């Protein structure tokens, strides 16, 4: 999901289950928690303060603006000489406080304000608010004052300064950036001071003083309760949003590491330009008729082929682990030499190693690089032979010319090179001599006489060179170039044959002695994080984050300086709230993106029930005040009872829906409607009290009677009821607007519209009544105070609503963006994993991705029974030709790519899921079955079942090639060899890791192909024994001479005895033998390639098996 952060501040119901708990701990769903919540780690707490700095700064500016406006309004009223009760200590202090608040406002408005400085400003503002509040208490400095009605009043009244203290208290909770405990202490001190001063200075003989003090105490309690709730919930929402964003950033960084690791792994297998192009097409396949070919042409490179002479005898004694270790040590060393000599290793085929210089980066001295590479390889293997007293040597062949490089097929990509010049380099290796670098005349011309050479006489040892009259030379090194000291073999007797373990040990020691070389474990260089300490700290922090139970005690990060925290710190330094606000509409604060706005509204408000409970408590407080000081009215009493009952019903309903896990029923529209109705209902109770207390019409004759309309339109004059508690009724109206502040997730726009309506009704009620003529109390003669109070309260609530809305929306935006980036990285990870699984067998790739780099060992696996298949197209070499008209052979390779791609698509079928493509070697396709590990309790398939799958695949390959011939008017013929037996699978080559299988089984399977007959499937006697029980039909071929094995009895697989393969395909001998065109349309024939039997480049006749890579794994004995 993009854009909706799971479990973010109050949104635990939308998105990932448990997301909120992960951020808030087990108690995260309670309405409010103990104060003083903060992270245990100072570093994380500092990050959170930095995260909220700009928003806290904006809130502080709003608080100082309200306080300045309050002090300024009171100062202006004093300046204009508004009548009122006897002057107290506040006389003359309001202008001073106004100046102080304005000065703090200017200081706070500095852009470069730091967290500590903002906290100091908040503390100063709280201190000045305390002095302001104390001076507003009902102290008396002078004698009796005269009311506007002319009546004498006491020296002070109990209601004096209450609304100012209520407003200052709420501002300290909702907008000032001070600690929660400090704000609570402020609220308690202010309330206690007013109550004590009132009790001490108001004349005790005033009737019902205790009732007035009780009403004041209830009002202070209500405001403090609402302030604490707003304070705690706002901070909790921000902390949860911060942790949610941090979790996403942590996951993103972890995924970034994994993706970087996967990218490095991908780059180690393929050149960057090829890998990036293939990755893009693999993830978003373009619509096209033909499969895209990833081939590039390089016209001036040098190709080196090298073969280890005598390796077969050395490896014949080894175990699986020893063989993989030996190969990795040798070829790891060769990879290091290739890097030093600016060569790129292309592939390892058995014990054959070939590389190219000048491929990825053009080099003018590519021939020199390859010669140096060949000489270094000879020196290396000579040192091995001397140290182990094993007859090992290296045969190296070089040629300079043109290559086509890239990847063929759709699965198990392997970078390779093709061209007639590659073929010639391969022949140069086969026609060379051990310990010599064999070069052609073309390569010699590129060396500019920098090396001494001698005639190679390659034509005397190779028919190919003799037929094409190719002159060859040997490089004559001037001296022994590189000697590997450090091995002492005095304890080993030369006459005694060494065991393989001894040979392997000495070989490993030898490989390590030069430049402290140690062959890397394959993929270890791409698995290791650059800073393991950072990774360890990140992992520790992650575990603690997931295991914490609360904010205050078990929160994360005992390890300071983690990578995630440093990353967030840099983000916060670059964060600009103004830019984030650009995503919001300035007036409505809605997101400009409709989809994001919809997802924001889908977040559930887990504190909505708590807000309703608080509204119920406030209604109960109004009921107590009504009973204490306000004249009772049946209408007001009924309204109060209805309000309490409705709120109780709402609370029960919300609790039931929450217990039954139906949070989705409270949509944003329902929550907004409930919020408006509850606020209007509670405010109506307070307004009803006001209506009952204020005189609505006075007779023109007397101030002591009230004119009302009776039934029938008659006017009735009633005696006026003294209502000294009208001030408390008006205070209830002010406090009645506070429920708007506790519904945090209701948008600010409906709140401000509702505030406007409530304020208007309040003013209308006051102006239409004669409230200035109410006898006694603080309202007597102070007509400005009720209007000033409601305007300041409404202004404060409007600013707070907008501030909370901005906070929640920016928190959501930050968390959503972090989660979107995390999800993007997750998609990249999955995409990279798909690509890696296309480069390596899935279980092998997963092994390296899951392994700890520090504990990673060589990957190897022994298998007792594996089916191996080689399928070649021997007459493709007759088809291949390099001409300007076909882009020097690219179009011919395009058709080969179509053939291999169709074979790959055939393997994608579910029936062939147990098959594993190993590689392609020129036009030879190599696959195996029985390599995948069995998962859990899944029954292991028998080798007979595996061989049936392999045989059916081979049969289907004939049909696929037959279809291609039909479409392209070609006559390609398939030749297949199958064998079964033990193999060793592993990954070798640290810098260019490569998965392969080795063993006598692989060699014999290759011989079954190379000694086979076109259009037939040749199998060994063991395969015949296992498959004849599965209704397959065979023809005995007889004894066949196999290199390294002598005479072997082989069979031709003809198909099933019932004429069908195991999944309904038919395999007919006549189709295999006659695959050429049968008429009809064409779809894939490359226009520039001849259909059959083209002349190969002059002087280069077709090779009998593979013109490209004659020194293949098929011809090597591992």
Swiss-Prot record:
Post-translational modification: N-glycosylated.
InterPro entries for the chain: A/G_cyclase, A/G_cyclase_CS, AC_N, Adcy, Nucleotide_cyclase
Record-listed Mg(2+) 1 binding positions: 307, 351
Region named Disordered: 1-27, 1079-1118
Membrane-spanning residues: 63-83, 87-107, 124-144, 157-177, 182-202, 213-233, 610-630, 634-654, 673-693, 724-744, 752-772, 774-793
Membrane topology, from the record: Multi-pass membrane protein
Function in brief: Catalyzes the formation of the signaling molecule cAMP in response to G-protein signaling. Mediates responses to increased cellular Ca(2+)/calmodulin levels. May be involved in regulatory processes in the central nervous system. May play a role in memory and learning. Plays a role in the regulation of the circadian rhythm of daytime contrast sensitivity probably by modulating the rhythmic synthesis of cyclic AMP in the retina.
Phosphoprotein recorded as keyword: yes
Compositional bias (Gly residues): 1-18
Highest taxon, organism lineage: Eukaryota
UniProt keyword list: ATP-binding, Biological rhythms, Calmodulin-binding, cAMP biosynthesis, Cell membrane, Cytoplasm, Glycoprotein, Lyase, Magnesium, Manganese, Membrane, Metal-binding, Nucleotide-binding, Phosphoprotein, Repeat, Transmembrane, Transmembrane helix
Reaction catalysis annotation: ATP = 3',5'-cyclic AMP + diphosphate
GO cellular component: cytoplasm; glutamatergic synapse; hippocampal mossy fiber to CA3 synapse; membrane raft; plasma membrane; postsynaptic density; postsynaptic density membrane; presynapse
Binding site for ATP: 307-312, 349-351, 395, 919, 996-998, 1003-1007, 1043
Name of the protein in question: Adenylate cyclase type 1
BP term (GO), one: cAMP biosynthetic process
Needed cofactors: Mg(2+); Mn(2+)
